[in-house]
C-alpha cells in the first residue's frame, strides 16, 4: 500500500510539474487589453510618406496597405526606370533622376479605395524615416538558420506586419563560422581561397535566402563586427572590410548592423578618432557599392556616438543592450529610454538614435541566450514601450518570436496612428518636457503642425495625470485624439487630464481647434 501511495504521489508530482511548465510556457491572454481598432475592409495605405534611394541603386518597396485582398495598386508619377506591380503592390527598378519625385498611390478593392502621396527622394541619403523590421538576436541567438529567416519573412506577411511598414528581416550574430569550434556545422574554414567570408552550415545559400525575402517585397539585413571576431565569437571583418562590403552586396543584403565587439582589442586608444575609425571605413566601402545598404552602428553609446554617428551611418545605438538591462522598480526599457531621450536634438532624417529593439511577445533571456518565453511586461508597460520608441523616432525593430505573435502583441506593434508618429517625415525626436518620480511627458513636433504627446506613469497604481498647455508651448483651444484607440476625445483649453494605469501611458495628438 505504501509503495502504491508513493507511486501515486510521484505521478501527481509529475503531472503538477508538467502542468506548471505548461502554464509557464503559455502566454497570458491579454485580449481584454487590446486598444488598437481592427483595420477597415477597404484599403488603407500606411507606411512612410518619403523614401530615400541613391541614383542607379536597385529599388524595392512593398506598399504597406491593410484591407481585404485582392487589392489593386495604381502608381502615378514614378521616375524613369521605375515601375509598379498592380497585383503585388511592389515598386521596383532604378533611376538616375536625382531629386524628389511625388508619386500618387491608389489602392482599390471591392470595399473602396485609398489614395496616398509618396515621395521618392533620389539622392545621397537613406533611412529618411527610422527603419522598421525584425532582428533575430533576442529570440534565436546562436540557433539562427536560413529556415528561421525564411519563416520570419513568411510571418511578416502572414501576420500583417508588412502592411504597417515593417520591411527588414535581419540576421544578427552567429551566421558565420565560429573561431575554434569543433562543431562541423558552425566551425571550420572561415574564409575561402579568395578570402571571401564563408557562412556556416545553417546558411547554405545566402543569395537564395535574400531572393526569397525579396520575393515578398521585404528587405534582408546582416550583422558583423569590425573586429577579428563577433560578440559571440564568430568571424569578424577585421582586415577584410572592403571585400566583406562587396560580398554582402553580391548576396543582395539591404541592411548591416556593425557591432564593436572585439574591435576594442584593435583600437589604439579611446580617442574619438579611434571610435569613429571602423565605422568610417565600412561606411566608405558601402558608399562605393551599386547597392543601398543601411548602416546601423552598434557600439553602446561610447564617446557620445550621437554627436558623430550621422557622419558614418544611418542609426546608432545610444546605450548597452536592452536585453541585459536589469531594471528595478521600472522595467529596463524605461532606463534605456530615458537615456536615449536626452539626445533628441541630434536625430534627423537619415540619422537616428537607436535605443535597441522592441522586446515583447516571446523573447529569450539575453543573459543565458535562452529559448523564448512570454514577456514579463504588463500590457500597459508594453503600450508605454511602443509609445516611447515611436515618440523618440527610434528604429522599430521587433526582436521576439515571429512564429508566436498573438493578437495583443500585434495590436501593440501594428497601430498605424502610433507608427505614423515614429515615421513622420519631419524627423524630429520627442523631447522630455517634464520628469519626476511620478511621471514624465514627451512631446514631438509633427510635420503637419500638430504635436504628439506621451504622458507616462512611473508609479505602481492608477493615477490621474495632467499636462498643461504652457508645458507644450500651446495656447487656446486644442483638439485631442487618443492614438492607441484612434478616437477623437474632445477640445481642451489650457490643460488635459486623464487617468493612466500603473506604468501606463496616454499617447495623444494635439491640433489647434481651427
What residue spans do the PLM features occupy?
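Strand-loop-strand motifs at the edges of beta-sheets in extracellular beta-sandwich domains
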Residues: 81-97
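Glycan-recognition surfaces
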Residues: 243, 292-401
